[in-house]
Design a protein with these regions (language model features):
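Interaction-mediating elements
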Residues: 2-135
């Protein structure tokens, strides 16, 4: 159970999660995405990563046996993410102050995009940005 009260805006949480995912992809998977964007929706965090495939994976996905190649890439990437899952969950829990209930992922070998979805045990506490007042 996460007990520390985290006081961040929704935008801060989304930015920190995007940075943590990029760091994980670079350090654990060996290559970072071109772009990562996290979205906090109640008790769900959705991360969209662009351009995650390596040049070798792209060649494999475009080979004459591309169906087999694409399935191999998907299985490999899902297996690697599952092995690194404790690291990812720990990073997310530290940022949001809420436990991760489940993690789901998929990757497109056609577009090179990956989506990661975290389901949390509860919505994180989010502070509202103070409204700017006119002078």
């Amino acid at each position: 159970m996460i007990t520390d009260m985290i006081k961040k805006t929704k935008g801060q949480i989304e930015a920190e999660i995007s940075e943590a995912i990029i760091k994980f992809e670079k350090e654990y998977m060996g290559r970072g995405p071109l772009e990562a964007k996290a979205y906090l929706i109640e008790d769900i965090i959705l991360i969209k990563l662009k351009n995650v495939l390596t040049p070798a994976e792209l060649r494999l996905a475009e080979s004459p046996d591309r169906k087999d190649g694409r399935e191999l890439i998907k299985r490999l990437r899902i297996t690697l993410l599952e092995q690194g899952r404790p690291l990812l969950e720990e990073a997310v829990e530290k940022i949001v102050g809420v436990e991760v209930k489940s993690l789901h992922t998929d990757i497109s070998t056609v577009t090179g995009e990956r989506v990661i979805l975290f389901s949390l045990t509860a919505p994180p506490v989010v502070i509202q940005k103070p409204e700017k007042r006119g002078g």
